[in-house]
Structure formats: C-alpha cells, structure tokens
Amino acid sequence: MSTQQTMTVDEHINQLVAKAQVALKEYLKPEYTQEKIDYIVKKASVAALDQHCALAAAAVEETGRGIFEDKATKNIFACEHVTHEMRHAKTVGIINVDPLYGITEIAEPVGVVCGVTPVTNPTSTAIFKSLISIKTRNPIVFSFHPSALKCSIMAAKIVRDAAISAGAPENCIQWIEFGGIEASNKLMNHPGVATILATGGNAMVKAAYSSGKPALGVGAGNVPTYIEKTCNIKQAANDVVMSKSFDNGMICASEQAAIIDKEIYDQVVEEMKTLGAYFINEEEKAKLEKFMFGVNAYSADVNNARLNPKCPGMSPQWFAEQVGIKVPEDCNIICAVCKEVGPNEPLTREKLSPVLAILKAENTQDGIDKAEAMVEFNGRGHSAAIHSNDKAVVEKYALTMKACRILHNTPSSQGGIGSIYNYIWPSFTLGCGSYGGNSVSANVTYHNLLNIKRLADRRNNLQWFRVPPKIFFEPHSIRYLAELKELSKIFIVSDRMMYKLGYVDRVMDVLKRRSNEVEIEIFIDVEPDPSIQTVQKGLAVMNTFGPDNIIAIGGGSAMDAAKIMWLLYEHPEADFFAMKQKFIDLRKRAFKFPTMGKKARLICIPTTSGTGSEVTPFAVISDHETGKKYPLADYSLTPSVAIVDPMFTMSLPKRAIADTGLDVLVHATEAYVSVMANEYTDGLAREAVKLVFENLLKSYNGDLEAREKMHNAATIAGMAFASAFLGMDHSMAHKVGAAFHLPHGRCVAVLLPHVIRYNGQKPRKLAMWPKYNFYKADQRYMELAQMVGLKCNTPAEGVEAFAKACEELMKATETITGFKQANIDEAAWMSKVPEMALLAFEDQCSPANPRVPMVKDMEKILKAAYYPIA
C-alpha cells in the first residue's frame, strides 16, 4: 500500500519534517566532525557524478525538454564545481579564531531546509541543493516540480543513499511523494522548517517569500548582452550562440536579447550564422511570437502576452514545426530582429528557449539604454552581459544595470552559474537582490545555509598618547624660534592685548635673529571665546599670504583660533558642521579630519598658564550666529611645536593667574577620573594637581618661581587630558561661558566642587568604555586627596575632603564660588538652566565623564552652582 493511500497530505508533511528534525539532532552530535562531513560530501558527489549521464537521460525523457549532453554537463557541474568550491570550507563548529580582535566564529546549521526545484534544471539542482545541505549539516526536504518528479527523486535518492552509506543521518534527504502544490505550500509553511531554498517560477518564489520565514529565492531574468564595437567579434558571437543554445536556453541566466553596435552589426550577424544561428524574417517572426506569447508585435493586446508553458527548453526544430516555418537541420538558435525593447516586441521578454531577440544599437548610449530596458522589463536584479574591450564602457554598463551579475566577455548561461568562466560562486540558485524582490544578491551556496555565531572576547579600545613632536620649555625658550628649521613665511595669530603688551614684538624680534630672511604677517583680531566668523576673517588674510609656518601666541583663544585657521588653510573643503559633531570613540567618528602639516606647521606659544591648548588636539570655537560654543577634537589639530616659556606669565594680573590656574586643576582632575584615564596620563594628571596645590596660591601672590611651576603644570595637565579627555565640568562650563560671557577658568572652578561630589557618588547610570571596567571615581578622588596631604580613610571621606580643598583654594585666590557673585540675575540664570544642561549633554567632553551625566542631574548642579558656598 502506497504512502499516498495511507495518510493525508498534512500527515505526510508532518512525518517528513519530524524525521528531518531527528536528522538535525543527529547532525549536531559531536561525532559529526568537519572531517566526517567532508567525507560524506565526497562520497555523495562521486555517486551522483557516476550517474550523471543516466540522470540527464531521465530528465530529458521525463520532461521532454533540453539537450541530453548539456544536462549531463550540468550534472557534472553540480557534482564537481560546487564540491570543489566548498571542499576546504569550514562549516562545522569553530570555523575561525581571530586572537587579535578576540572573535571566534562558530558555524551551525540553519535547520530543516525546504528545497524547491524547477523543471528546467531538475537533476542538477537536486544534486546541488543536496550537497550544500550535507556540507552544512542541514536536513533537506524537497518539493520537486511535478513535471520532473521521477528524475528529481532519482537524483536525490542517489545522493541520499551514498550519504547514508558514508555515515549521514538516515533522513538527511527526503522529498514529498504526493500532494502537488498543496503539499508544497504546507511544507513551506510548516513551523518545523527553518528556511526555504527556492528555485523556480515567480509564483513559487513569491509563495516562498510569503511563508513568513527566511527564504532564499530567486527572481526572473531577462538577460541582455550588449555586443559593443570594441569587442572580439568572433569570441562574442561564439559565446552568445554557445550560451543561448546550451540546454535549449533553459538556464535563467541565458541571453534573451543581443544588442549589437551598428558598426559591427553585419559582421556579428554573419559570424552567428556560421555558428548555427538562423535569422527569421518578419513573416516568420509574426508566427513565432504569436505561438510563444499569444500576441503579435505592436498589436492592441501586447500587454496580455504570456509565455506558452510548452516552449521552455524545446529545440529550434520543434519551434519551426509548431509554427510552420523551416529552419536548417543544424540550426541551434532562432534569432528574431526587433525594433525596440518592451511590450510592443514580445520576443524581448524572457523565453527560456533557444530564441534570441536581436537589436541594433545606434551608439554606445543607445546600446546601454536598450540593455537597461531589457533588465527593467521583468528582469531586475538577475544578470546582464557585455562584450567589450573598452574599460570605460564596461564600467558605465555595470554602473547602469540593476543586475546582480554583470558578465564581461562571457557567455551568460555559463557565466551566471559561476566557476567556469569566472570566479562567481557556482550555483543553480541565482539571487537577484532587492531589485528582484530577493533576500540575496549573490549566487546562493553553502554560506547561506549556516548560522554563524560569534564569540566576542572583551577587548579594550585602542588608546593613544599624542603630543606635539617638539615641546620646548624653560625660561626664554622662545629663542628656539631662531633655531627651528624651515621657517621663511610666518603668519602670527594673536589678540590686541598680546600686541599691546609687546609679546608679538618679542616673537618677531627672535624671528629676525634667524640666519635666513623671513616674511611675517600678523593677525591680532582674535577675541575671547573666538568665533568661526573671526577664524574666517583670519583665514582670508592667511590664504593671501601663504605661510609655511603659523605661530599662535596668547591664551587658549589665540591658539584655538589658529588651529582652525590652520585646518581650513590646508583643507578649505573641511566642513565645520561635521567637525563639531560629538563622538564616542575618536578613531571611529562619523567625520574624519584630514591630515595636517603639508602646507604649514603650527607653533603654539602660551602666555597664560591654563588651557594647555599648546599640546592638545582640542579647539573651542563659538558661533555668533547660534550663540553656541563648540569644542572640536581631533589629533589632526595637535600643534607641530609647543614653546612653553614662563617669561610670558611673569606680569600676568592676579585675576588671570587664579582663573587659569584653577582651569589647570580642573583639567588634571577630570583627566585623572576620566573613563579614558590610563597609565600614560595618570602620572601627568597627578603631578599637575600636586603642582597646582603647591604653587597656585604662591603664584597668585607674586612668587615668580611658582609662576614657572604653574606654567609647566598647565602644559603637563594639557598632555594628560589630550589623551584622557575631560568631563562634565567642562561640558557645563562651555555652555555657561557661551550664555553669560564669563571667563572659562572661573566657570570650571565654580562647578568643580559640585562635579566632584556628583561623580564621587556610586552612579546608577554607569559610564561606557571598555578599559573602564568598573566605577572607580570615588577611589581616584581619594587618591588625589591623599596625595595633596588631606586626611581621609574611605573613598567617601576622600571625595568630600578633595571637594573642600578645591573650595578653599578658590576662596584663597578670591575666586567666586557661585555664579550669583558674577552679578547674574537669578531669574535669567534659572531660565537658562534647562537649555544649558541639554547642550552640556551634547558637548564632546561628556562621554569621558566617570558617570553618565544625566540632563536632570546637570540641571540640579547648575542650579546649586548659582549660589555661593558658605
């Protein structure tokens, strides 16, 4: 009694899937090693290869389509090329280990596969899908085309039996025995099926994609081949005739139209005729198109054209007999000259038979346009071929075609399935990508039947320590300007105060002592909190002058402005909008700063002991149009040379000493507790904090040696935060300074005790940075407190002690401890708090803070910071 008589379709499908699930469990057992799987594949492929002729004969006999010899070749291709391509591929367990990046890849089967096969390539497709399923340890259940059922089962049985004999699970390959379309649909929609491997007509492929599960389906092709005037004519004609006649044109990648440049049209046609192509006349064409599509060219019902299902894979002689025309006995393809591509010419549709449309191209663009029209005419995503020796034409063709395989100087049938004429993956399932409504654009192969798991070991982000290549320090170190090589055209960036104090003249005096003559241009219009508008003004002067060195002398404003002028001088295409965007990892930012130093060097000479800009990759620029302050950061902005000469600070007013000195303290403190703090920056940060507590008050009171120490402390802190970055104190201070026009050092100082206490609490929103493997800011504040001699036994005590010590230093230097003391109206301040907090969150300094600075928390800090400390 047959299976069909003893069970329903539902029972049959359930049984097949249940057996496949058992096979899947078997495949997952440890004994199925890579070596065993490869052995099974080898035995199964050889068994199918041994029967390639018998299978070809069975396919031709059952379907009545195609050519025996070509089907035999396709069977060999499925056994040989497909197996060769995956012979050394790892598909079991651990398939790749990358110790450098800490990634281990593990391959697992996707699960039970539903394999759907066509009438056009029944046995070769069954072999192909069976072998790639074995290679990936996936049980497969086939739904064979009813018109090729016997030969397909024959192919699957040969592979299955050989695989089981070699050790494969008993039900590794199965097939539906009855039920037709109903059974096929039930299999595709069965919850036990993991994926669908579908090759066939549009309706079947759409059904696969509608199943609600992953499907590897393909789309229809309408493949053009453009025979361009620079081609090898004999080769092109040979390829087209060979490809189109192969298995009577049943491969979906076969040419459906040849578009020939007018300059070589006659030669190509004659060459094709010598190879067996028969060109029909208009009367014969009318008969053929009527038979194949039910309509005639340019008739009223051309849009109703449908391919006669009897046509695919039939011989030219069969067509001649059906339509009542005569073709030579040795004719291998029928060619029909068409006027255009589209519904008006039915023969420019996909035909899957040895019938080829022929069109003449008036020029290269016309040829490409006609080919594009073919692809767009129900062939999107599949394939397109071109025969040409003009690289520019080939590239233009490839860029134009919405096809996933562009086959160059290649017969498209053999080129499309891969491995013979090129190195495309060998396959009988050709993906068409989104152009054709498919999930894959490549040739489907074993890769597509694997789930790749990735074991990712923890890896710290690469970190960096970068400072200017040359840093000169000690009193009177400005003299190095007379010795530095390659200075001839110097552009000095400064502000009017520096000019009035004679600092610019000091620089010019040293430059004039050089052994070579120098040209000097000065720009002294930099304002506090320099703007992009000022930068553009200075840049215009710089572009006219064309310097080979830029010298910035002054505080942070002059140096920051000079950095951006330098950038735009070397790279006028640089986009300020992109530069100001926030990032988490400097190396992975969305915008890449360009390489600097090709046109000029940047030499920075600080005249205040605070910003550290002379050694950092940062620049803070304001935009008068938006009223916002933007901290820019990239190592491209690191100056070429820093000259840290304390003589420029000896006459600084006390207020500037205090403001800039407290800025140094904040720089060092934030660098030390930053999530990006590291062994290279920690020592610098600690030393800077120590120098500030030992020397700031002395410097404030006029001690010249202490001023030298503070000048060094500023640069040391700059080197620390250049690599460790800053935190939320600076984020908020940037916004306060922009909104109320207060000195930067004063802003960060007022906020510092509040930020220390905030960061010193165990956070509920933890910071994200791989090297920062647990919260430790409270411990680090305690370390700083103990280093400067404060008594504390616990992190909590250390946090409070350090915050109070900072407050005491502020009071000792007569610095405000609340923004109210800056004569800011309380209502005006409070109204700005929400905006300042939000902008502070967007600030580039926020990501390195040791706890995530929540907007609401920053609002609380800003409100509290308005009121002076008692």
Swiss-Prot record:
Cofactor: Zn(2+); Fe(2+)
Domain of life: Eukaryota
Reaction equations catalysed: a primary alcohol + NAD(+) = an aldehyde + NADH + H(+); a secondary alcohol + NAD(+) = a ketone + NADH + H(+); acetaldehyde + NAD(+) + CoA = acetyl-CoA + NADH + H(+)
EC annotation from Swiss-Prot or TrEMBL: 1.1.1.1, 1.2.1.10
Described function: This enzyme has two NAD(+)-dependent activities: ADH and ACDH. May be a critical enzyme in the fermentative pathway.
Gene name as annotated: ADH2
Entry-linked InterPro entries: AAD_C, ADH_Fe/GldA, ADH_Fe_C, ADH_Fe_CS, Alcohol_dehydrogenase_Fe, Ald_DH/histidinol_DH, Ald_DH_C, Ald_DH_N
Bilayer-spanning residue ranges: none
Organismal lineage: Eukaryota, Amoebozoa, Evosea, Archamoebae, Mastigamoebida
Claim: Phosphoprotein is one of the keywords in the record: no
PANTHER family the record matches: ALCOHOL DEHYDROGENASE, HYDROXYACID-OXOACID TRANSHYDROGENASE, MITOCHONDRIAL
SUPFAM superfamilies: ALDH-like, Dehydroquinate synthase-like
Protein's name according to its UniProt entry: Aldehyde-alcohol dehydrogenase 2
Family membership: In the N-terminal section; belongs to the aldehyde dehydrogenase family.
Residue sites binding NAD(+) per the record: 431-436
Pfam families: ADH_Fe_C, Aldedh, Fe-ADH
Record keyword Iron present: yes
GO MF term set: acetaldehyde dehydrogenase (acetylating) activity; alcohol dehydrogenase (NAD+) activity; collagen binding; fibronectin binding; laminin binding; metal ion binding
Active site as annotated: 252
Cofactor binding note: Zinc or iron.
Protein species of origin: Entamoeba histolytica (strain ATCC 30459 / HM-1:IMSS / ABRM)
Keywords annotated in UniProt: Iron, Multifunctional enzyme, NAD, Oxidoreductase
Subunit structure: Seems to form a rod shaped homomer composed of at least 20 identical subunits.
GO BP terms in the entry: alcohol metabolic process; carbon utilization
GO cellular component: mitochondrion
